[in-house]
UniProtKB/Swiss-Prot annotation:
Cystine connections: none
Role, per record: Plays a role in virus cell tropism, and may be required for efficient virus replication in macrophages.
Annotated ANK repeat ranges: 54-83, 253-283, 313-343
Highest rank taxon of the organism: Viruses
Species: African swine fever virus (isolate Warthog/Namibia/Wart80/1980)
Induction of synthesis: Expressed in the early phase of the viral replicative cycle.
Entry-linked InterPro entries: Ankyrin_rpt-contain_sf (IPR036770), MGF_505 (IPR004858)
Protein name: Protein MGF 505-9R
Keywords: ANK repeat, Early protein, Repeat
A Pfam family assignment: DUF249
């Protein structure tokens, strides 16, 4: 409970002059050595009717002098108990400390308010159960470097604690203490600073890490080069442009950066270096972009740096496109408003040679490729499976399919490819009924293209049709064979004519 005097003192905001010195003293509003004190609002104190101080500063001074009554008064005026403890520590007023410390209970709450390292240490000692490690940890939090300067030697040999404090200082970004620990104590894992710098994206911390590393090794040290390379890879992977530039100050290869920048589509990094590197490197980057399935903007940036000229490495490019099944660059070159570069057929040929049916169909849909073109390529490359599947999909009607396959044979020069298509036609006719006209047309077609075995098979089938018309057809085929020196076709036609003559009544 407050006394009547305390209630008066707590709530008195009136001027003190009319009260006289005696009343002021009786009210406890006189601060010995300083003069009268008056409350000004909730946060300030007027001393001797002249000086205005923050209440927490006033209670700190009063506590340092050991003036318990004035301390009590200022606490009534919403002064801070924590600053009272600080003042008592400054004046070594242990009676006051003993009286008020229990109301706080934990000295660590006060530490951030203390600027003087000696008082800081005294405050920490109030908790008798605390260790040196606790003192150092709070010194890091509160940037109290003098604590390390005073007791740092006690850490020598304690590798675990040194590492713990070093990493804590890095996480809290306390650069002064990081420097002191790094240069004065043996930190067995200095590189921990870089991991923390990457996570916090703190370039100052990152630069400080190199300063500490270079205190131990030179830039030509193999270990240092390995560290730089790892940093460049990670920084460029994450798109940390400033970190990349910082690492390159100490060494490393720009190529390392560029390949990661392409892979992860960091165009800011790429644009900074792209015009400073040789064409051969750009070509490798484009191939890497295909492998990494880079974005449209990344491809355009790379291609524009070589003016979209891909001829010198077009074979490698096509190989990469087909191998990694990524066709964006083909599309970009085709979409150019001027000087289009059409690699659709070239890529298609490699796809037909090496890829699966599904991959080829996807490409056909993407670039609106005519099925005939694919079937003819498949025939040249002896891809029987593709001929069958693609022609079946393109022309469901069997007679329609035969018609298109015949057209392809007529326009092909590749002998083996033509034969393969004709055998495909023959396989279709094996389970398709042909009328007289269709059967005769197909027989003549085989004769024109010197398909001896197929011609013989069709001749056998044609005997079921009108013999007179068939004989006329055979004479046409014989004429064709003689004109082109198709000896086996001529022999077969001649034999069939003789047989018809033999069995036909005269």
């Amino acid at each position: 409970m407050f006394s009547l005097q305390d209630l008066c003192r707590k709530n008195l905001f009136l001027p003190l002059e009319p009260l006289g010195k005696h009343v002021v003293q009786r009210l406890g509003l006189y601060w010995e050595g300083h003069g009268s004190v008056k409350r000004v609002g909730d946060c300030f104190v007027c001393v001797d009717q002249i000086w205005v101080l923050p209440t927490h500063k006033a209670v700190q001074i009063a506590a340092s002098e050991g003036n318990e009554d004035i301390v009590k008064l200022f606490l009534l005026w919403k002064g801070s108990l924590q600053y009272a403890i600080i003042g008592a520590l400054e004046g070594r007023q242990y009676d006051l400390i003993q009286k008020y410390y229990n109301q706080i209970g934990d000295c660590h709450q006060i530490l951030p308010l203390i600027q003087d390292p000696e008082i800081y240490e005294r405050c920490h000692e109030l908790n008798v159960t605390c260790t040196f490690q606790c003192l150092f940890q709070h010194a890091i939090r509160d940037n109290m470097l003098p604590i390390f300067q005073k007791y740092g030697e006690d850490l020598n040999g304690n590798r675990g604690m040194v590492q713990l404090l070093y990493e804590m200082a890095c996480r809290l970004q306390n650069y002064d203490i990081i420097k002191w620990i790094g240069f004065n104590l043996h930190v067995y894992n200095l590189e921990a600073i870089f991991s923390i710098a990457f996570v916090r994206k703190d370039l100052t911390l990152y630069s400080l890490g190199y300063m500490l590393l270079l205190g131990r090794m030179s830039t030509v040290d193999r270990n240092f080069i390995s560290i730089i390379t790892r940093h460049l890879e990670y920084a460029s992977k994450k798109g940390l442009f400033d970190f990349v530039l910082e690492s390159l100050k100490y060494g490393g290869q720009v190529d390392t950066v560029l390949f990661q920048a392409v892979k992860y589509n960091h165009r800011k990094i790429l644009a900074h270096f792209i015009h400073e590197i040789p064409r051969e490197t750009v070509e490798k980057l484009i191939l890497h972009a295909v492998e990494s399935r880079a974005s449209r903007k990344t491809f355009n940036l790379l291609l524009s740096s070589i003016n979209y000229c891909v001829n010198p490495f077009v074979k490698k490019l096509l190989h990469a496109v087909v191998k990694h099944k990524y066709m964006l660059i083909i599309k970009l070159l085709l979409e150019r408003p001027k000087k289009k570069i059409n690699l659709v057929d070239a890529a298609l040929f490699k796809l037909v040679k090496y890829s699966t049916y599904k991959e080829i169909v996807k490409y056909m849909d993407e670039f609106s490729v005519d099925p005939k073109r694919v079937v003819k390529m498949a025939a040249r490359l002896m891809r029987v499976d593709l001929i069958k599947k693609i022609s079946n999909d393109a022309w469901e009607d069997k007679l329609e399919r035969i018609k298109h396959l015949k057209q392809m044979v007529n326009t092909m020069n590749h002998r083996n490819g033509k034969n393969l298509l004709m055998y495909n036609i023959h396989n279709i006719t094996g389970y398709t009924h042909l009328n007289t006209k269709e059967a005769f047309n197909l027989t003549k077609f085989y004769a024109v293209h010197n398909a001896t075995c197929l011609f013989k098979e069709m001749c056998k089938s044609c005997f079921e049709h009108d013999k007179i018309q068939f004989r006329e057809l055979l004479e046409d085929c014989l004429h064709i064979a003689n004109r082109h020196a198709y000896i086996q076709i001529a022999e077969t036609a001649d034999e069939c004519i003789k047989y018809i003559d033999l069995i036909t009544p005269k």
